[in-house]
Amino acid sequence: MDNVFPELTRAEEQVMQVLWRRGPSFVKDMLAELPAPAPAYNTVSTIVRILETKGFVDHEAFGRTHRYFVLVPQDEYRRFSLRKLLGGHFGNSFSRLVSFFAKEENLDAAQLDELLRHAAHPSIPNPDEPIQPA
C-alpha cells in the first residue's frame, strides 16, 4: 500500500530538502543551507516542529537543543508527490505527463529516446542526477 502524506508548504519542503541532503542537523545548520533570504532561526525552529507533528522528522535532545532527522525517505516522498501530480493533473497517465513536458521543454528526439531508455531500464544512471554516496 502506498503511503499518503500530509501536504507540505514550500518552506517545509525546503527544510526537508536540507535534511535529506545533510542528514541529521541542528536548526543553525539548516539555516545556513536555506535559500536567501534566509528565514529567522525561530521560523526554522517552528517549521521543523511542524514537520515533526506531521510525522516527517523526529529529534534527539542535546541539552537544550535538538538535532532533527528524517523519518520519511526522499524517494518515498518523491513517489507520493509524483502520484499526486499524475492523478491531479494528468488523469493518472504517465504518457500525458511525458507529452506535456516534451512540449513544454521542447525535447528533441534524442532526449525522448533517452527518457524512454531510462523508463525501460531504471538501473541506467541518470546523468543529470547527483550520485548518492554508498
Model regions and ranges:
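Short capping segments at the starts of secondary-structure elements
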Residues: 18-26
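Hydrophobic residues on short alpha-helical segments
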Residues: 13-19, 98
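Short, hydrophobic-biased segments on the C-terminal half of alpha helices
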Residues: 45-49
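Conserved segment of winged-helix/HTH DNA-binding domains
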Residues: 73-98
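Glycine-centered, phosphate/nucleic-acid-interacting loop/turn motifs that mediate DNA/RNA or nucleotide
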Residues: 55
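C-terminal regulatory/oligomerization modules of transcriptional regulators
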Residues: 103-134
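Short, cationic-aromatic polyanion-contact patches
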Residues: 5-11, 62-81
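Short acidic, hydrophobic short linear motifs in intrinsically disordered regions
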Residues: 25-34
